[in-house]
Regions:
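Eukaryote-biased activation of long, low-complexity terminal tails and linkers
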Residues: 1-227
Length: 227
């Protein structure tokens, strides 16, 4: 392709468990392979799955048949979606990204969400798939701001992540309108819709999708006046 002067890419590859003859490339190997001057800057993430649980955590609905994952993308990143972001993400400014899907077997901590907010300044949708509780329980940390976040989905996440985002002293979400969550998590974080620490964020929501049957108490409607 002699006329090609620009090639932007986002490549996600997986290696099956039964492919024992394949040698895995390291991050360093991948970076060296893109050193030629005609290539643009490239970022890469290489992960190894040691058991079915870890593999399931990383790739969610995909089969438990993989034992490694490699994500390579050109910089600047020109795509609107960033799929399967894990704790291996090293940061960087990806201004075009509007939607991020986070998943891992290890917990996402407060400081990592700070990296996410800085790396994706235009983020509008965040989906978190992580059943591990956070290890850092102190809430007197630096306030994190997601200035453009409109949609938050923590339905498949531990209750700690709902707390992380809904407590206004942890996260400032001035444009959040849509929340997807389990009823158990919502009732816990809001203390049955009486917690003042989550009231401000919840009061601005216009759409709440709740998994699980429930009879909303009177305080529910007062807590979500825009529903």
């Amino acid at each position: 392709m002699p006329r090609l002067n620009k090639f932007s890419f986002d490549i996600d590859t997986y290696v099956e468990k039964n492919n024992n003859q394949m040698d895995f490339s390291s991050n360093e190997d991948i970076q060296r392979s893109f050193k030629r001057k005609e290539y643009r800057s490239v970022s890469s993430i290489v992960e190894y799955f040691t058991n079915e649980k870890e593999c399931c955590c990383h790739i969610c609905a995909m089969p438990y048949q993989f034992r490694s994952r490699c994500h390579i993308y050109s910089l600047p990143y020109e795509f609107q979606d960033f799929p399967f972001l894990t704790n291996s993400f090293q940061g960087g400014i990806l201004e075009n990204v509007l939607s991020v899907f986070m998943t891992d077997c290890s917990s996402f901590e407060h400081n990592f969400f700070k990296v996410i907010s800085q790396s994706f300044p235009r983020l509008q949708q965040l989906i978190i798939f992580n059943g591990e509780p956070q290890k850092e329980k102190q809430r007197s940390m630096t306030l994190i701001k997601f200035a453009h976040l409109v949609i938050l989905d923590v339905e498949s996440a531990h209750t700690d992540y709902a707390e992380q985002f809904l407590i206004d002293k942890c996260c400032h979400l001035p444009r959040l309108l849509n929340l997807t969550i389990r009823y158990e998590s919502l009732a816990t974080v809001t203390n049955n819709f009486t917690n003042d620490a989550t009231r401000l964020t919840c009061s601005q929501l216009t759409n709440v999708k709740i998994r699980g049957l429930f009879v909303p108490p009177k305080s529910f409607h007062q807590y979500f006046p825009l529903l």
